[in-house]
Amino acid sequence: MKPKTGNNANGLRLLTRGAVYVAVVAVFLVGQAFTQSPTPGSDYELKRINLPGATGAVALDYFAYDRATEKVWVPASNTGSVDVIDEKTDAVSQITGFPTGEIERHGKKITLGPTAASIGNGVVYIGNRGNATLCAVDAKTFTRGECVPASPDRDVTPDGVIYIAATREVWITTRPTLGGDPAAAKSLQVFDASDPQRLKWKSKIPLEGLAEGYAVDNQRGLFYTNIEGPGKTLAIDVRSHKIVAEWNPGSADLQGLALDIARRFLFVACGDHVVSIDAGHDGKVLDSIRTGAGLDNIDYSADAKLLYAAASQAATLTIAEVGNDGKFHLKDTVPTVKGARGVVTGKGETAYLIDPAEGRILKLIRK
């Protein structure tokens, strides 16, 4: 996503090509969490889960929920760690030892490290902006395996990381490194993940602009992403790596994506609203719902047929039901905190939001 702690100048040329990082993984539990007062009239409440080692703001971006283990993986960038939250107990395990790098942006120094997570086949893939690498971590033991460069050249660093189960590949959206060629980041980097623990760079897919957000339909072999600048949403065939459709969601401020695979509704975050697109019929815009300003990643629960969209500036979480016609029906608007953005769904109607300013996760619970 568009990092709120630095965008295009967010990587360092620190990695020797082909290097493999071997590190001791330190894991400990943090059980401190408290529930804020429920909002009158709302069916939901928020529980605050503090991240270990966070004494202030933490650069948080892409995080992920592993349905097989019922754990939430949170790359806590500037702490040099990845934090794993147990959904049942809210205990937090910390995987340490990820390299960080210091960059300068707008005259200020910023420390970045791991910033993106994606659930793979028994592993979790971690993108690290601090040293422009992609690492595999065992989903059960939390043991960190091999780390590889995010690209054959040194001009790009990972943004979003996506495991494509249909082809056993990992795709990453990218941003330029500090001093790197901005044009190099206008592509998707593709890795062979047939051996889940040992990624191998495979190819890149050229794009018209920077990719922003993603959603994957493994059933039909389609990958969706937004393109900054032109304001387009693309559908890409995961086997041929060819762009098969381009749609206009009606906004130039495109953020995250979510997908109802069964009904083929694609949801596009557009700054202060979300649109519903008919991905099965030429990308027709079916509906739109206002959320307030400051959207980033959104998510969708296929089981509950609910869309979740956190607006950082409005400090609200919009929860909307999606009908069989692709139209939204507002279910609840839950007050959050300023800066809370990005959401992933857990079991049932549980969801998680990132709160970078306070270095914590907000857990949404139905009363």
Predicted regions and their residues:
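N-terminal secretory signal peptides that target proteins for export/translocation
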Residues: M1-T16
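Predominantly soluble domains enriched in secretory-pathway, periplasmic, or organellar proteins
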Residues: F34-K367
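Bacterial N-terminal signal peptides
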Residues: A19-Q32
